[in-house]
Amino acid sequence: MPLWDWEEDVLADYSRLVAEVHPDVVVVMIGANEFEGHVLEGEALEPGSERWAEVLAERAGEAMAQWRAEGAPVYWWTTPRMRDTRFLTDDLIAIWEATTTAWGAGVTSLDSMVVLGDASGAYRDRMVDENGRLVDLRKARGVHFHEVGADLLARQLEERLVADGWLVDD
């Protein structure tokens, strides 16, 4: 179970960071801990339940309000699918997509599985790199990714930021 308070820790941190940094853009990837068994005011939130989805959707909107407080555009990566299908990443993606759609202009969803997934967007542990070598994308539990996965995501973001005029392609 997460050891933080949503309003006092998370939202306060988001607000403080935006106020201190005044970001030109905000980049977000969250969701790996959304299956850890949250309790809200004594109510256990079963991952995948309707109530769980309602709470996460509300929190996604609250987070977005903090990130967009000074008008910076938000680039939100979808939560990468994980090896263990008990991690209901497709449910999370639906919540994140609904949030980005609701906020409209200035909020962009980036599909992490375009670069981390196989040709159909499904989970994969390894990939063949540009040198023809088989390299690991994910760490042992199939949740977090190795540097090569992070590099793929960074390139995906860079391409989008160039396309949107935030960066200049050398």
Stretches found by the model and what they are:
Residues 1-54:
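Conserved SGNH/GDSL esterase-like catalytic core that processes O-acyl groups on lipids
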Residues 9, 13, 25, 47-51, ...:
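Extracytoplasmic/secreted proteins, especially bacterial periplasmic and envelope-associated proteins
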Residues 15-21, 65-66, 166-167:
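Surface-exposed acidic, glycine-flexible loop patches that form ligand/cofactor-binding
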Residues 21-26, 69-75, 103-107:
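Loop/turn elements at helix/coil->beta-strand transitions in domains of secreted/extracellular proteins
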Residues 81-170:
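Catalytic His-Asp segment of secreted/periplasmic serine-dependent ester chemistry enzymes
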